[in-house]
Amino acid sequence: FLADIKGDLSGMCRPGVDSEDMQKRIQKFGLAECGFNYHNYPAVFWDIYGDMGIPARTTISEMGPILLAKLMDLNDTQSDILTIVFKIADDRNLLLIDTKDLKAMLQYVSENSAELAAEYGNIAKQSVAAILRNVVALEAAGGEEFFGEPAMNLSDWFFSGDMSGRGSINILDCRQLVHDTTLYSTFLLWMLSELFETLPEVGDMEKPRMVFFFDEAHLLFKDISKALRGKIEQVVKLIRSKGVGVY
């Protein structure tokens, strides 16, 4: 998986073109003796906004209240109430697909807070209203495109990309996404968390099953909350035992 900040990684889907500079590099590193040749690689293009690739989407329910609270930078009280909102939806078998579903659920909880208090505890309408404002801000930042169906199925990435058995290189166009570092960071954390939860433990492998390369990685941590940064660091350290490398 490659996060493409500049838009220059997409060229690997086509064979390279020889040049004088390339010949110098081939000779310098002795690549001719290794059978070097120009060829393309199986590539799949993704884009959260759906402009330059397959829309990279997940649902509100799959993201969960913990990551969603970090994405919206909610305080402890608001985070607890968001968790309760998810619990109420779950108890009623209601799937939260997109931000419209979440806003409707928040409005329902606010309007019925008195009746719900006996089972779920006190739910302050002011806190629900604050969460609702954050959801609106999230929509404006690209959340309206990110949350929805069909959701990404990360297990599909482990199937070979062509008839020769080569795996696919998944490229995420980040030229627009990089301007919203919180959404960028949360998307990264969601992907790694999903893989961590679903993949079996494999210990130290000779070669990883999957690798993530993040171009301009310092931008991931620019202007994001300390809690979100800490969670990313934790998952990156733990996911190695699942056969996933992060670079």
Show the residue positions of the predicted features:
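P-loop NTPase motor domains
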Residues: 7-237, 241
